[in-house]
Amino acid sequence: MNNYLVKNARLWNGLDGKMGALTTSVWVREGRIEALGQAADADFDGTQCFDETGQFLIPGLIDAHVHLELDPSLRSPAQQLARTPDEIVASMKRYARDMLFAGITTTRDCGGGAHREHGLRAEIDRRRVVGPRLLCCGQPLTSPGGHCHFWGGEVSSRLEVEAMLSRQIEADSDWIKVMATGGVFTPGSRARDTQFELGRLVSIVEGAEKAGRHVAAHCHGTQGIADALRAGVRTIEHASFVGEKGFGTDIDESLMLEIGRSTCWVSPTVNAGWGRRIKDKEGAPSVFFERMSNCLQKQRASGIRFIASTDAGIPGVAHHDLAAGLAAFSKYADLTPVEVLRSATSEAAIALGVEAETGRVEAGLSADFLLLDSDPLESLDALNDPRVVVFRGEWLDRETRRVAPAKA
């Protein structure tokens, strides 16, 4: 379908504080939004119309942090690395399809080991594979033996940094990823430890900027968060304020205020796994929930700008399950549905540098939107099963999504 009109849906454009009170029309032509409202009704020159009375139309969702190369059913790097390249590519195609069918129309892949996500991006763009708009970080820069070193991004000297940056740019990575601290997934790595001195992080950011790329910094420990901010990264991933006693135990409120005053965004990777940790076995609020809700709510109070992200692919976090992550995010950070939805649409688009293409329902942008049976600004549960997903103008209703096979 290259030219059609969606009529009688209530619209949330990705910016407003509430759902549109009146129904409206959206004209889609050649994969883009041609016009809205009265202009769409007056100027539409096609014949195909969809009467969406009772439906709620919102922008397609954005997950700002996933790992398509990872299988969430596997628990260790050794298990991940034991898979064959063909197995990995086949699973990546399935995950991409499942993400789009769940309403995720844009995502940023925050790291893998062989630039397979770049090939997947090309196949999606050529419409050979069903999947969302894909932004790729490539191999994360990490210290020798550091977090995710098995993906081949180990660097120490300035020359090694320059060579690794060049490798990512030559692969046509959209972003550069750096592991500013240790992580949880890598044996022998401690999440609170810094992996690079501030000067080295500065050189990574400067090198990326010369190539026209922003930097995403994996940061759990508080010192690593501070160093990444001062080095000038665009997004801080996780921002967990990990201390000796665990996540959310080394909070620095002055640093939070500094982040809030900056141009940096925080991508907190709250996901379905976090949702399963809200209560302990006795049904009381868990220690993890109390610590991380306090951490995120202090960040919010400090003026920090959040973007929705899940770290999908890590153990137990399915790539398509952004809706569950958004529900958990609302609880941990004490956000209203509209605040959560902005973080997963217009705000995420700005942070990722694609606001001229997507993130809002607006004339001139890509036709990326969802039609929902109920109002997501009243309850985020509305996101669990979109009636229709539209990506680059392609109409994917429930029946189409349920019978569509993954393209080989």
Where in the sequence are the language-model features?
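N-terminal metal-binding scaffold of metallo-dependent hydrolase/deaminase domains
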Residues: M1-F44, Q55-L57, S374-S379, E394
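C-terminal cap of metal-dependent C-N hydrolases
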Residues: A9, A344-S346, I350, A363-K407
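Divalent metal-coordination and catalytic microenvironments
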Residues: A9, V26, G31, G54, ...
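Metal-associated gating/positioning segment near the N- to mid-region
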Residues: Q55-R126, G199
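Active-site gating loops and adjacent loop-to-helix segments of metal-dependent hydrolytic enzymes
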Residues: H67-I88, R97-L100, V130, G138, ...
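Histidine/acidic-residue-rich catalytic or RNA/ligand-binding cores of hydrolases
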Residues: P72-R75, E117, T186-S189, I225-V233, ...
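Histidine/acidic residue-rich metal-binding segments in metalloenzymes
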Residues: G119, E160-S240, E244-V266, G283-F306, ...
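His/Asp/Glu-enriched, well-ordered alpha-helical/loop segment
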Residues: K210, F289-L372
